[in-house]
A protein has these predicted regions:
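Accessory, solvent-exposed terminal regions and/or long lumenal/extracellular loops of proteins
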Residues: 593-696, 719-721, 728-797
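Catalytic-domain carbohydrate-binding cleft regions of carbohydrate-active enzymes
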Residues: 2-4, 11, 81, 93-585, ...
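Surface-exposed beta-strand/loop patches in extracellular or lumenal glycoproteins
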Residues: 36-42, 545-558, 667-687
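Solvent-exposed beta-strand/loop surfaces of large extracellular or lumenal domains
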Residues: 48-62, 305, 563-583, 690-714
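A surface-exposed beta-strand-loop module
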Residues: 71-73, 79-80, 702-724
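Short, well-ordered beta-strand segments enriched in hydrophobic/aromatic residues
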Residues: 27, 35-37, 74-81, 536-539, ...
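A low-complexity, Ser/Thr/Gly/Pro-enriched, surface-exposed linker/loop concept
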Residues: 5-6, 30-69
């Protein structure tokens, strides 16, 4: 094995024109707001990549240097740097960031950054909030990323300790330009890789002693129940655990299939593949390879150990020989049999033979890059190991408690990870262990999972603990199935966002303050987040109110008009409100003019291939555009020629509304040559004036009323992928008009209050309409009831 394949991509050497250097210091001007500072007593500096940083080759920014003798002054449009040329100290190195209050925009060396935080290594045993590590964004406008103690990357693909006791850190002084800050972080530390398409479907996972027969029966039950999954996770009992002879210790680590449970592993995995599943196996590699393992003889021989000695092969990711043996003799043979990727469940600390080197980082780095060896897109599944871990997706967040407190923390935890570039967390949806049974909690957690980077249902080894939908009450079962289907419908949208995350440096999930950093309200809703370009999400993390049968979520609605994804209800933005929903829905809002491509699903379909049938949601607004991007979903390299794009546009003016699907461009071989389109127009309640394909009237178009979003459905079948579709509505097409009184009636009908109060409230609303709010506030109503009435009557549309 050539270990050079483990060298990080990028050019770690900066441009000479960007450097200001002295006998013991070096300052590198990467951008006008991103500066590298180094100090070393021995006068040596680091030009190799590190565990965190892989590229310093930035265009030289504009800057000015003023040499004041004993003090050095550097100026850019964003920063003033004042440095005394000595060992870094609070009095000797000061940076002022442009904009804002001067007292809040000054940093002295050693100041603890007051940033917006980032993420954490794990949520293991979390029951609510946990501390988070630093991020790169701050309301003060600056933050610091310390790279002094990471390892350097050698040209041979191995890590190496750095020389001397040197200071090496990066100052981010972007003010509130959070998106620009993040994009330059990716430029410095490596881009987020493109994920395989199958990762965006639902994952099934359970810590349970499955047998091959039981797992197959489970998959067939999912098919019967129309609950789609695309990834089958098999936890640790796939290998020998309880049958390990005591002389070898525990069975926590293992690489030998338990043939009692899985008598024919290749056949089992082939069966799963034929049913549309990719397979990942759980491994805890800390105990190395012991003599009872099937692979032990060949592993021992390759490591220079006599197999007859039964001497264990110790786990050591600092040994190049072990790394080669570990992959070629343990993992590659099992991948040949059908394993698609590995769940690296490392829980054994941060110590290796090399001081300061974290074994988790080594596992993530080497496993991810090795996973390309079969010519497929790289993937691993493991915990976060510090800044730069975004290069090794997907993240496994660990074993959370099954409580409402855990659920409440998870939306914030997920969105906030973008502040350190970590965009692909996978949580134990529904919680892992302890806690309590609460069907409503499970429903809300699954809803969150569907609108999360990954949706992986999971639970611990407990006969009462499982996330199969049919184990819950009928209402929650229905909710779970509906949302599992929705996740698979969302794959075309999610996969396009996957490309955007990798190429544009824009994570799928982003905190609300990214786009409105000067709005105080955006910092007050930590559980709200953008979900790609078209949507924002405000998950419900509280129980239903017994009076209304609804639960609320505090929500900041950004500027503009927004529409409810599920029911088409319109909201005027620029304000903070409580949004109330029953158990069947959650607050997901779509910005005006949005176009959202979905997979059109009827019945059971767990395929994540580029679909032949597409469903497109089109929302009111003057204009909108969405480019659907598709490739084969698993090609190892992200090349332009792999992709096909389908551009969709919508315009609305005094002449009417026009929606166009342009002919597919690019590598059309990876998509069906003919497609059927279900186009749903929110709030338009007339048939189109005209439907054309390549300029010719399409007489076979079908039309239907869309009751869910109060609109019109246009159906076209077997349209060539290289054809243009155009749907035109007349300027006077009927538009849905909301009936406030009817909406209030529906709420009151279900409310658990006196009939007299129902009658009184309804009378006030009928008489005063949206002007009824002050009267309702004075009526001493249940807070939940008043909240939902306020939502309906103050939406502004």
């Amino acid at each position: 094995m050539d270990l050079k394949k483990f060298v990080l991509e990028g050019n770690p050497v900066c441009r000479k024109e960007a450097v200001i250097v002295g006998d013991h210091f070096r300052i590198t001007m990467l951008t006008t707001a991103l500066i590298r500072f180094e100090y070393s007593e021995d006068g040596g500096f680091e030009d190799r990549a590190t565990q965190m940083v892989c590229n310093r080759d930035f265009p030289v920014p504009e800057f000015r240097v003023s040499d004041g003798g004993e003090e050095l002054h550097i100026y850019t449009k964003d920063l003033e740097i004042h440095y005394d040329r000595q060992k870094f100290s609070p009095s000797g190195l000061m940076i002022r960031v442009a904009g804002g209050k001067a007292s809040e925009r000054v940093w002295h060396y050693g100041d603890e950054p007051k940033d917006l935080l980032g993420t954490a290594r794990t949520l293991d045993e979390a029951d609510g909030e946990i501390p988070l590590s630093h991020g790169i964004m701050s309301r003060n406008g600056f933050s610091v990323l310390d790279d002094s103690h990471t390892m350097a990357m050698g040209e041979d693909g191995m890590v190496e300790p750095r020389q001397g006791n040197r200071a090496d850190f990066y100052f981010f002084g972007y003010g509130h330009r959070y998106v620009e800050c993040l994009q330059d972080f990716y430029r410095l530390c490596g881009k987020t890789p493109l994920l395989p398409r199958y990762t965006f479907g639902n994952w099934w996972s359970r810590y349970h002693k499955y047998t091959e027969t039981e797992y197959k029966e489970l998959v067939e039950r999912f098919e019967k129940e129309e609950a789609p999954f695309s990834v089958a996770v098999v936890d640790m009992d796939w290998h020998l655990v309880e049958d390990v002879p005591p002389v070898y210790g525990s069975g926590w680590t293992g690489y030998t299939w338990n043939k009692k449970f899985f008598p024919n592993p290749p056949e089992f995995m082939d069966w799963l593949h034929k049913h549309g599943y990719k397979i990942t196996l759980n491994v805890h590699p800390a105990d190395g390879v012991r003599a009872y393992e099937e692979a032990y003889p060949r592993v021992a021989e390759k490591m220079g150990i006599d197999p007859a000695s039964k001497e264990p092969v110790l786990f050591d990711m600092t040994d190049p020989k072990f790394i080669e043996t570990y992959f070629e003799e343990l993992h590659h043979p099992m991948e040949e049999e059908g394993v698609d990727f590995w769940w690296l469940d490392w829980q054994q600390g941060t110590v290796t033979k090399v001081p300061g080197l974290d074994p988790l980082w080594m596992l993530n780095h080497y496993h991810y890059l090795d996973s390309k060896w079969k010519g497929k897109r790289a993937l691993t599944f493991s915990r976060y190991a510090g800044p730069g871990s975004h290069r090794y997706p997907v993240g496994f967040s660990g074993d959370t408690f099954i409580t409402w407190e855990s659920l409440k923390f998870q939306p914030y935890f997920t969105a906030n990870a973008s502040n350190i570039g970590f965009g692909w967390w996978s949580h134990d949806i529904g919680g892992h262990m302890f806690g309590y049974r609460d069907d409503e909690l499970t429903a809300r957690w699954v809803q969150l999972g569907v609108f999360s980077p990954m949706n992986r249902l999971h639970s611990t080894d407990n006969p009462f603990n499982g996330k199969e939908p049919w184990k819950y009450n009928q209402i929650v079962e229905t909710v779970m199935k509906n949302f599992l289907k929705l996740r698979h419908k969302l794959v075309p949208y999610l996969y396009t966002m996957n490309r955007r995350a990798s190429r544009a440096g824009l994570p799928l999930v982003q905190p609300m303050y990214y786009l409105e950093p000067e709005r105080e309200e955006t910092y007050e809703v930590p559980n709200n987040y953008y979900f790609g370009t078209e949507m924002m999400v405000s998950p419900i993390t509280d129980k239903l109110d017994p009076v209304t049968g609804l639960a609320g979520a505090k929500t900041w609605i950004p500027q503009g008009i927004w529409y409810d994804f599920f029911n088409g209800r319109a909201y005027k933005g620029g304000r903070k409100v409580d949004l109330w929903r029953d158990i069947y829905e959650m607050p997901v809002l779509v910005r005006e003019g949005s176009i959202i491509p979905l997979k059109d699903m009827e019945g059971y379909d767990n395929s994540i291939e580029n679909p032949e049938k597409l469903e497109v949601l089109v929302y009111p607004g003057e204009s909108g555009e969405f480019v659907l991007w598709e490739d084969d979903g698993d090609t190892p390299e992200d090349l332009d020629e792999n992709w096909v794009s389908t551009r969709m546009t919508k315009t609305a003016d005094e002449n009417g509304t026009v929606f166009i699907v342009e002919a597919a461009q690019g590598n059309t071989a990876v998509i069906p040559q003919k497609r059927s389109w279900k186009i749903r127009f929110c709030n338009i309640q007339d048939k189109p004036q005209e439907v054309t394909v390549n300029g010719q009237v399409y007489k076979d178009a079908e039309f239907a009323e869309d009751e869910k979003i109060h609109g019109t459905i246009v159906l076209l079948k077997d349209v060539p992928a290289d054809a243009q579709v155009k749907v035109t509505f007349a300027a006077d097409a009927a538009v849905y008009q909301r009936d406030y009184a009817e909406e209030v009636y529906e709420i009151l009908e279900k409310a658990q209050i006196t009939y007299a109060q129902k009658t009184e409230v309804y009378k006030v609303v009928k008489e005063l309409g949206t002007e009824a709010v002050p009267v309702l506030v004075s009526m001493n109503l249940n807070p939940s009831l008043l909240g939902v009435l306020m939502e309906i009557l103050t939406m502004g549309i």
